[in-house]
């Protein structure tokens, strides 16, 4: 199992089990601008878990412990279907591209301000490069990008980021997206190699939400 960078800062007996929650240790909802809440708001952006690692995770298991009455859905986008749907001339452009993924970049672009990473954290989680298009064991292909994707290798930074934004807009169109409305006790498992996901915004300062997460280590990217 993977241990999230944020989990390393929490004194828990089982660090591989990570609570994504707006409820503090004292049982009260944390303030909107507190680090715990700011971190959660970062998950409102499309992303795939741990793509900032040299070997990203395989899948994520998310269990709903407590959910708000309205909002707080998780949206999933099918990156295989999105890639399959793009024109052949666009496939020729993107097939050979490599993307630099960076934990420092995604933290810096969080909707709220997170504390700066220490030198030890920067050394532990350096930028890493992955193919923009992943090829799976069955031969299918999918986009691999999201919130940790900083820029495209060998391309001017702004130009690469514009292309990534365009591809993200294409691949998260309604026809590629499933919205899961949570009920307490739900367990959803997804393949991070071929999906993006994000939290649908909700009243994070007014309603409790406790989600328990486990992330499974992956294998080298092809």
Question: Where on the chain are the PLM-derived regions?
Answer:
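Fe(II)/2-oxoglutarate oxygenase catalytic core
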Residues: 1-189, 193-222
């Amino acid at each position: 199992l993977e241990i999230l960078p944020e989990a390393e800062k929490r004194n828990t007996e089982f660090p591989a089990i990570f609570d994504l929650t707006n409820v503090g240790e004292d049982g009260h909802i944390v303030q909107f601008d507190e680090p715990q809440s700011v971190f959660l708001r970062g998950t409102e952006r499309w992303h795939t878990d741990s793509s900032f690692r040299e070997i990203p995770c395989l899948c994520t298991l998310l269990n709903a412990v407590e959910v708000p009455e309205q909002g707080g859905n998780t949206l999933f986008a099918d990156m295989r279907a999105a890639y399959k749907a793009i024109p052949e001339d666009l496939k020729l452009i993107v097939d050979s591209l490599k993307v630099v993924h960076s934990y420092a970049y995604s933290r810096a672009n969080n909707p709220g301000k997170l504390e700066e990473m220490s030198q030890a954290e920067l050394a532990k989680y350096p930028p890493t490069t992955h193919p923009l298009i992943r090829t799976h064991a069955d031969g299918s292909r999918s986009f691999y990008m999201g919130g940790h994707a900083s820029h495209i290798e060998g391309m001017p930074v702004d130009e690469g980021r514009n292309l990534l934004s365009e591809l993200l807009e294409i691949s998260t169109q309604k026809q590629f997206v499933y919205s899961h409305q949570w009920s307490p006790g739900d367990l959803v498992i997804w393949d991070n190699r071929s999906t993006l996901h994000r939290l649908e915004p909700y009243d994070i300062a007014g309603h409790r939400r406790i989600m328990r997460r486990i992330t499974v280590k992956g294998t080298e990217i092809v």
